Amino acid sequence: MLMLTHTYLLQKVLGAADIKNQDLDIYIYNIAPDLLTIHPNINSDKTHNIKRFAEIPVKYPQSVYVMFHLLVDDLAHFGSICLDYQEAFNPESQGFCYIKGKPLIKSILDLHKIIQNEISYNEAAYRSHLIIEMIYDLVILKEINSLKTISLLVEAINFTFKNKLAEFTSTIGWLYDVQESDVQAVMKDACAYLTKERVERIMNIEGRIRLYSDKFGLKSKDNLFYEGIKKLFIQAKNSLELDEKELFLHQAAKTIKDYGWMPPIT
């Protein structure tokens, strides 16, 4: 899932547990597995390929919020919590995003034939799940706006950079074995890149098409190709809206609670 969905779910979980007055840096720990990939030398395999734990490390208690992110992604990608990261790609995964993305696969394959840039079934399956992730926070946008999630996330980034950077870099450095200078660079870039205006600019279908096209280098000027991608996103959005919109989030929160995850008491 994308960073806004992760942030919104954490807001809901903490609200349901009546946990208040937490410092805002917890939301940046929660998006760290995605945020760190801003750095050219850090990829999602590195940020997601760590052993899962529910216990709270005494010296690095905020790392439990990184784990919350990874547990949610496990359920979205694999359909269950994985004690160890699953390196082998499975296009038939029973994770929420892959199940929901499966009806898009054939259309993705056909679209790439239009620009004579054919891709494999496995690659199409991977891209289909990303479309689901990219559209999901648009499906729950009303709920996101009701909790002012965008403003919260932007405020949290700036708060962490100004007030909690040393602690954050130390924790992330321990968890991922990365240079603290790299973490500091990520946070500096995040403050410049993740502004309220920039985030709001991509909170629509067109913004998500740009994200998708940029990620995969799809620069085709073929209008039929563009309309095909747009149709995929609309199809995905309509499919998700047929369900109870937050069902996956409710189920994920319960599964993670049953697993034993809980925020540190401060």
Residue ranges, per PLM feature:
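N-terminal leader/auxiliary helical segments
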Residues: M1-T266
